Amino acid sequence: MYRKPSRQMTLDDFSLPFSGSLSTDNRWVRLARIIPWDQIEKEYAFLFPSDRGNVATPVRMALGSLIIQAKCSYSDRETVQQITENPYLQYFIGLREYQVQKPFTPVAMVKFRKRFNSKRMAQVNELILKAEADQQPVAALIDEEKHPTNNHDDDDTNKPSGTSTAGTELTQQEEPAKPNQGTLILDATCTPADVRFPTDVGLLNEAREKLDEMIDILHQGLGKQEKRPRTYREIARKRYLTLSKQRSPKGKQIRKAVKQQLQYAKRNLRIVEQLLDKSSKQTQPSGLNQRYMKLLSTIRTLISQQTAMYQTRSHRIQDRIVNLHQPHVRPIVRGKAGAAVEFGAKVAISLENGYSRIEKLSWDPFNEAATLVDTIERYRQRHGYYPEAIMADRIYRNRDNLAYCKKHGIRMSGPRLGRPIANMAIKKAEKRLEQQDARERNAVEGKFGEGKRKYSLSRIMARLKETAECVIAMQFFVMNLEHKLRVLFVQILSMLFRRQNTAVLAEI
């Protein structure tokens, strides 16, 4: 059940002890002003259609706590602790007065991330970008009212007498398509998950240890009616350490160790299945909990994949598991000097006027060039026209994308196809244009750098698939909020300078 607050609180509604007051210049107060809480609440209330049960957490508290965590890179416990100690953070999440009690437990942060998944965060992000787009025509209209021009007449004397409503509708229907406007910058990156660098021997050893834990639990649940099955855990551990302590083991040694750990893991898996069968036949079954059953399913898949790769002497397989606790994580080949392979989600984004949108988020590798057409079509749906130019990497310049851009009159950055131009003047002009495009495309590289250095895009700490996607989407959402604050500051500053110049000219 969701209960909507009577109205969204303002700064004057928040009460402090000892007759204090909050500063209007605080960063959290300014940030709370630019977020459309009422519009987000309308979408959030649909998650709770029932009118029974406990009252859900308000949207400002749920989303606000996630924004605080993403902006400051806090853990769940630290986020709750900071909110408890800071009155500005309590105002930001919608509390009416300062309180010393914790507004919620750290476990609630996981529920908040599940509610605001990547699709819902994309909708919230669009509300912010739409509000910014709506402010630009208003600002232009205000400037036009302050500085009117004489290029148009307000009287109707010059209008033809034969006009009608039907004629107006016909004129609107026959209006030609709008010319291409704007610049769209595209790029993709990998957001690494918080996983250890995987090796075949290490994964099999970890699977063997987890199966040993399951055997202990199942054997204890059976009441120790029989002797515990032999698993050779000490010998298996010793053989694993023999290889892992070597600096550069040879290929034959690695293959031998994989075979040994694979045999130990298969033996433990057979024992677990036998104990599960015995446990199900009891009057009071005492099997594994949901977490262990999910882990057991992942281990089965891992053993199957490792067996197939060992038999075929290959190191590649589809949907390869690289972590037992995060089976959705896949290896992403980047081919860069720092990290040839990263393990996490791949994100393709578009940058428009400094604001970023997630065009595609996938845990499986994909070619970002395939997202160009859909990205341009979504741009056209938002604005009613195609972009004038596309700034993208060379991987986007395949034949299909170039033909699509040529068909719709869109210029794509990069060198032209075909033979080099003999005319030196044209060649120099194209070279200058390529350099200018490269400078403009640096904005998206800076956006990735901002997310990975200032925020937590360089390591996603969330372990569940849906919560990790929420964390990734939240990082770009917070960066858009920060950019909006910077744009708002520049607009206010330019307005002050304009008024000052107007006053000086009036005195002259």
Q: Which functions belong to the PLM regions below?
A:
Residues 52-57, 87, 391-399, 418-420:
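Acidic, metal-coordinating catalytic cores used for nucleic-acid/nucleotide bond scission
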Residues 1-35, 42, 139, 151-164, ...:
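Charged, often Cys/His-bearing segments associated with DNA-binding zinc-finger transcription factors
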Residues 22-67, 72:
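Basic, short loop/linker segments at the boundary and entry of helix-turn-helix/winged-helix-like folds
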Residues 323-338:
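Flexible, glycine/threonine-enriched loop-and-boundary segments that flank and lead into catalytic domains
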Residues 96-326:
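Active-site- or DNA-interface-adjacent structural scaffold in DNA-acting proteins
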Residues 336-383:
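Electropositive, glycine- and tryptophan-enriched low-complexity nucleic-acid-binding patches
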Residues 26, 65, 79-83, 105-112, ...:
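Short, conserved catalytic/metal-binding motifs centered on acidic residues
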Residues 292-298, 303-310, 432-508:
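Basic, amphipathic alpha-helical segments enriched in Lys/Arg and hydrophobic/aromatic residues
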